[in-house]
Every structure is written in C-alpha cells, then in structure tokens.
Amino acid sequence: MSSRDFSNDLFSINIEENAGCVVSAKVQANPLVTQKCHKEALKTVKKNVVLPGFRKGKAPDNIVESRYSTQVEQELRRLFLRASFEALSQMCDRKPLSPKAVRSSAIDTCNPVNGGSVSFLYEAFPVIPSLPWEQLSLPDPEPVKEISEEDLENGLKNVAYFFATKTPVTRPSQEGDFISLSLYVSKRGDENSTPVAIFENKYFKISEEDMTDSFKARFLNVSTGHRVEEEIGSEDIQSFLNGDLLTFTVNAVIEISSPEMDDEKARQLQAESLEDLKKKLRIQLENQAKEAQHQKRFSDAEDALAQLIDFDLPESLLQEREELLSREKLLNARLVKYCSDSELEEQKQALLEEAKADARKAVKLLFLTQKVFSEKGLSISREELQYMMDVCSRERFGGYPPKDISNEMIQELVLVARDRLTYRKAIEAISSEKKDLEVVPS
C-alpha cells in the first residue's frame, strides 16, 4: 500500500493504492467550492418553485432556502459530489477507469462556510512501466503454406456441394450424411418449465472431421424423429443454461450426392472451364493461406506483447473476463465437444486454469495496446473508423440498423470501433516492425 497527495487552490487529495488497482481517496475542498455548489443548488431549486407574491423563479434566496432547505441540501450534496469526482479525475494520476468503477462514495462533510470532504473507493487505470522493447521475443514469420494437389481436390469437392443433390431419407443415418438437429434445455420434473432452444435446425455432417467421436456415436444409425434426452449433472452447466435436461431432436437425415465437376458446371461458376476454375480456386486457397499466416503472426505478436511485462490489473475487469471465459470453455466442452458430465469434471480444473490465464492475457493486452498505440504515434483515419462502426453496427443490429438510433448508441459504437482499431493497429505494428524490436527465430 502506498499513499500520495495532490493539491491545487481548491482541492487537496490523498490516495492510498492497493492491489488490484483499488484506490481509496479522500478529496477535501475549500469553502469556495462548496459556496459555488450551494449557489448553483439554490438556483436550481429556485427556478422550479412558485411562491405567493412572486413570479416563478424570482422568490428571494433566503425564503427559498428556508422553505425548501431539504431540496437545497440534496442538490448541494449532489453537485459537491460531482465536483469532487471531477477533481479526482483531473488532478490525480490514478484516475478511475470510469464512473462505474467507483465502488463507493461518501460525503463526510459538506458546508458552504467550512468546505467539505468526500471519500471514494474505486478501481483505477493500471500503472504500466516503460516497455522493454529489447526484450521482446517474436518468432520469425512462418512460410506461407503451399497449396498441394490434395488441397485443390478437397476444394473442388467443397465446390461440388453447390451442385449436390440433397435428399431427405427415411433410412438410418450413415457416414457422410447431414442431419438437422434441434437442441432444447428444460428443467426435469418442472411442469411450468418451458423448453428453451439452444439451437434449431442446425446442420451437422456425420464425419470424423466435423464431429467428436462421442457426438458422432450419438447420431450415427438414427432416423428422423429420433430424440436423445440427457440429464445435466454439472452444476456449472445447469447454472449457465438454467436447466438440467438436454433434448436433442433429429429433424431430418439428408443424403448428399455430389456430381463430378466438369467444364459446364465450371462455367456456371463464372469460370471459362474446369481448368480455369482450378486456377481460380488455387488463387483463393493461396489467399486463404496468406491470411492464415497473417493471423498466426498476429497471434504470435499478441503472445510476445503479453509476455513482455507484468503489472497490476483492475480486479473487477479480470474477474469479469475470467467468468466469461470460464463459462464459454465449459459450455464449449459440454455442448460442442460433447463431453459427458464425467469427462467435463475431469477437464474442469484445466479449463478453468486456461480461462484464468486467457483472461489475464486479454486484460493485459487491453491496456498494453493502448500504450503501444500512443508510444508508436499510430492513428485512425475517418474512413477506418466509419468502416469499423459499420461492422460493429451489423454485429449489433444485423443488416438493418434502426433509423432512430440514439446518440448514446452512436457514441457506444464509436468507442467500440475505436477500441478495436487501436488494438489491431498496435498488434500489427509489433508484428510488422523490425528495426527497433529484437526478433528471434522460432
């Protein structure tokens, strides 16, 4: 714990810094501050009252204060609290993360004659030391994957699905079929429980590539209408889903018959011939390989930056991200990888440790990328910001945002878009820069 002081002509502030970026602060104001707040409070109350013999808002101050002392006092305290928070945010180098980061605020004293004091407990922005760039360990970029004939053939098979015959069948499902599944969660034995859809009419290919072994075993050799009920034993999953019974329903079993690709089908896909289609497909696969290399480089830069330095992180942000990632990982194991309750229990500790590490990395990078963005003198163009706002808007509202979107929502979209661009540009600067960074072979 460390204690420091800040002051100017109107305020004196003492802060005590604790682990988790938790700061307790005492803000003391001289009488000039409380006198100003009192004057504004009286003016606010006065303009809203009507007294006999006076026009609205024109009653003498002493009469208003005498008759509406409670309202004046409440407004005075509100204004004084706001002024104290503004002083704390402007004068102190451990600024609150946001108004929501204030855990508690208490007015200790507030008097127009004698001044006042306020106590705050809040989470502050972390203190990040200078970044030791000479210690950054970034592996060399991996070579772009070469596209093999096998890759090309697999790509053609995927293209052939465009022309495939999709036939619902009554026979039991078999390898290579698609099945349409719906999954609902409910509360066993609760007559008032209404099943809630986790997904409906979602298509899965019965294959080793697209299904885990346990998931595949459940839906191989089953027919349309088949139902699988599964009790959820994990209390974590029960809590996340608000239920303890999963019900899978097979809506359809679909047989896929894909034709051989030829020149005619290639022309339907805007290619001159099958050979031309293969050339275009190869270019597409090569571009995908380049993007995969870029994403790997981006991920390596994230890891390198996160490992570069350690510093204290805001407690609540860390906890919030850890809870979110823990939920995602446990649900993914249960509903996507289709682990049984016993398998989930075996993996649970490792998954929670993984979530904890990932949460710490994510929160560290949130603040480190802001520092890198500032130190490297990076910038965001108007066009980049508008494009990212459009992306964020589509994610929030779909393809058709509301016409009467509020100013608050626009501001939120701007902040989210700016944060994303800041993060991306900072990481890309690290992944591409050479001259000032130590780059080591992998």
Swiss-Prot record:
InterPro entries: PPIase_dom_sf, Trig_fac, Trigger_fac_C, Trigger_fac_C_sf, Trigger_fac_ribosome-bd_bac, Trigger_fac_ribosome-bd_sf, Trigger_fact/SurA_dom_sf. It catalyses: [protein]-peptidylproline (omega=180) = [protein]-peptidylproline (omega=0). Gene3D superfamilies: 3.10.50.40, Trigger factor ribosome-binding domain (3.30.70.1050), Trigger factor, C-terminal domain (1.10.3120.10). Residues 176-259 form the PPIase FKBP-type domain. Keywords: Cell cycle, Cell division, Chaperone, Cytoplasm, Isomerase, Rotamase. GO terms for molecular function: peptidyl-prolyl cis-trans isomerase activity. The keyword Hydrolase does not apply. Transmembrane segments: none annotated. It is an enzyme of class 5 (isomerase). It holds the Pfam family Trigger_N. Its EC number is 5.2.1.8. The keyword Ribonucleoprotein does not apply. One of its GO terms (cellular component) is cytoplasm. It is found in: Cytoplasm. GO terms for biological process: cell division; protein folding; protein transport. Consists of 3 domains; the N-terminus binds the ribosome, the middle domain has PPIase activity, while the C-terminus has intrinsic chaperone activity on its own. Belongs to the FKBP-type PPIase family. Tig subfamily. Involved in protein export. Acts as a chaperone by maintaining the newly synthesized protein in an open conformation. Functions as a peptidyl-prolyl cis-trans isomerase. This is Trigger factor.
